[in-house]
């Protein structure tokens, strides 16, 4: 379980050994696919279990998408993070509210819930939306002598569009600007414990490494990544992946970044109209053109005072609505309500 086990230094200077897991984390549901992962879903499930009271965790089995076993001694809840066409959720297809194995289906966005309703006909009466949450990024000053663009999610979600667009914009526009424009890439599949999936993207990673103004960093633990976001100005995300929510976008908004992304899947709902969205298109070249226009505008505007004021409002909104302190109260109220209904 990465980044959860604590390390205790032995007083005799022997090999460090893992500390015992906190009680709340002993009941976190894991499976063969996510045991070594620390992506957005894992950040959410560990974050939830760290914050919920032990007495509630003893009464509820909270399963993030992939059902392996159902505990007969606890009330089962299915916390769905994936898409409606994922094979892991096929068992929900046309199951009536009466036959559903779970006391509640918990979704992370209304877009996602509607997809499950349209494709699998899940019962609205058993469904609830509980948006994702983050720990707000603290107030900070950004570098004033450079413009830093960041991409900090897995490569299959849009890196193949971003790199050639940045190369083109740098050659045609950025190289002539007063401030240098740099792209920082934090991306690979090691975050999920799937290094073998990096292979199709190695050529793209090499292009990043070879460009003087693109900096390929691999991946970082989430806490270190959030510190790096404080140095960034723009989140560039030409998303081609149907996000059910997006932790990377939430953390970028909390860090006060001007976010440029496609209006695809749950991204408009997640962004709540604070970002620079552009219409999605299936055409790869047209997508690059739309993204390039928007990214160039973002770079040209990011230093203007009205943009800084808007980003300050964006940060306050994100830190309020998507704050774990708020979300955990909603989770507790929901669970306590289910207990009341079960009595």
Q: Where do the protein language model's features map onto the residues?
A:
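A charged, aromatic-enriched C-terminal amphipathic alpha-helix characteristic of glycosyltransferases
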Residues: 38-43, 282, 286, 306-339
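Nucleotide-activated donor-binding/catalytic signature segment of Leloir-type glycosyltransferases, i.e.
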Residues: 197-223
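Donor nucleotide-sugar binding/catalytic pocket of nucleotide-sugar-dependent glycosyltransferases
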Residues: 102-117, 122-139
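Conserved donor-binding/catalytic core segment of Leloir-type glycosyltransferases
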Residues: 141-158, 163-166, 184
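Acidic donor-binding loop of glycosyltransferase active sites
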Residues: 230-244, 257
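Active-site proximal beta-strand in glycosyltransferases
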Residues: 60-89, 103-107, 128-130
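N-terminal pre-catalytic "stem/leader" segment of glycosyltransferase-like enzymes
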Residues: 1-70
């Amino acid at each position: 379980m990465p980044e959860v086990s604590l390390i205790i230094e032995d007083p005799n200077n022997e090999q460090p050994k893992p500390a015992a897991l906190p009680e709340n984390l002993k009941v976190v549901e894991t499976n063969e696919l996510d045991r070594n992962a620390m992506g957005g879903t894992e950040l959410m499930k560990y974050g939830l279990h760290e914050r919920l009271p032990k007495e509630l965790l003893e009464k509820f089995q909270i399963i993030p998408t992939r059902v392996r076993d159902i505990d007969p001694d606890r009330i089962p809840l299915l916390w769905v993070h994936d898409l409606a066409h994922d094979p892991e959720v096929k068992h929900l297809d046309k199951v009536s509210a009466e036959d559903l194995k779970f006391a509640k289906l918990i979704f992370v966005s209304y877009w996602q819930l509607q997809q499950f309703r349209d494709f699998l006909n899940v019962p609205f009466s058993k469904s609830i939306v509980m948006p994702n949450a983050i720990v707000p990024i603290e107030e900070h000053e950004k570098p004033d002598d450079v413009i830093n663009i960041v991409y900090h999610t897995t490569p299959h979600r849009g890196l193949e569009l971003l790199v050639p667009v940045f190369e083109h914009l740098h050659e045609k526009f950025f190289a002539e600007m007063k401030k240098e424009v740099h792209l920082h890439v934090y991306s690979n599949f090691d975050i999920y414990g799937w290094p073998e999936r990096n292979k199709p993207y190695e050529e793209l990673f090499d292009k990043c490494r070879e460009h003087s103004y693109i900096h390929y960093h691999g991946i970082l633990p989430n806490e270190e990544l959030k510190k790096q976001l404080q140095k960034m100005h723009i989140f560039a995300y030409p998303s081609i992946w149907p996000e059910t929510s997006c932790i990377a976008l939430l953390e970028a908004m909390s860090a006060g970044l001007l976010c440029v992304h496609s209006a695809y899947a749950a991204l408009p709902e997640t962004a709540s109209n604070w970002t620079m969205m552009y219409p999605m298109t299936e055409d790869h070249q047209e997508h690059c053109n739309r993204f390039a226009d928007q990214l160039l505008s973002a770079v040209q505007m990011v230093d203007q005072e009205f943009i800084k004021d808007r980003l300050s409002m964006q940060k306050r909104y994100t830190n309020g609505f998507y704050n774990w302190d708020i979300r955990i109260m909603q989770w507790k109220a929901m669970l306590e309500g289910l207990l009341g209904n079960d009595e």
